[in-house]
Amino acid sequence: MKNKGKAMRNMLLGMLGAAVCMAAMWLSFAYGKDNDRNGLIMSNWPKMPMIRFELSIIFVAFGVPLYYLGAKEMVKAIRLSRRRKSINDLRMARLFDMCMHLSVIGLVFIQGVLVAIAIVYKLLFGTKLMGADIIYVVESLFYYFAIPVFAYLVFSLAGTSISFMYFIINERVKVSKICLLFNPLVMFGLGELLKLTKIYYLVDFAAAMIPFGFLLMLAAGMVHVAKMPVARRRRRTE
């Protein structure tokens, strides 16, 4: 692999970006103790200071470009690791490429939509509108975005995770088999299980499981890149 050192530095920056996105999600989706959920509505939204939502958007705007640096190096590493004559490898590499780029767009899009819904609810809560009217407005707003949000979530999580696991199982990515768990789909599922505990600090921790999954995947990819041979330049013969 050419520029191996640069690739590893970019992947490290990508991990930093994913960590910043985790902080953004904790700021906006860690609702704290005694939060009750009513459909899409969180009872603690009005209690949360507006600065948390504002910082959340700023963190995502800063973290996603850093994450993209790692994501594009991850795509390159997967492309170089596939077998040239394998159709399945080619398809999975293309799936990984597409879904990693979707994850970059999706982190901004999904975070922006969900934070906007929380802000709208918080602002309407301070008006004279009835509670039922507020819920109707907020849920109607969400359903306008539901299809693209759901599509980005499914493709960015499932596509990257399944294709990444494929390359580990078939030993194209040279990492331990435990890294099969290091992907956003598995972390998302683990987060949903944590939410079932109803223990508020576990529920709050689960808010950042998706970027945590991407962080772990980049870490596994970085280990793989470290094991890849350095491409040597061919000497020109006179």
Residues of each region from the PLM?
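Hydrophobic, aromatic-enriched alpha-helical segments typical of multi-pass transmembrane helices
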Residues: K2-R233
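Intrinsic disorder in cytosolic terminal tails and internal cytosolic loops
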Residues: R234-E238
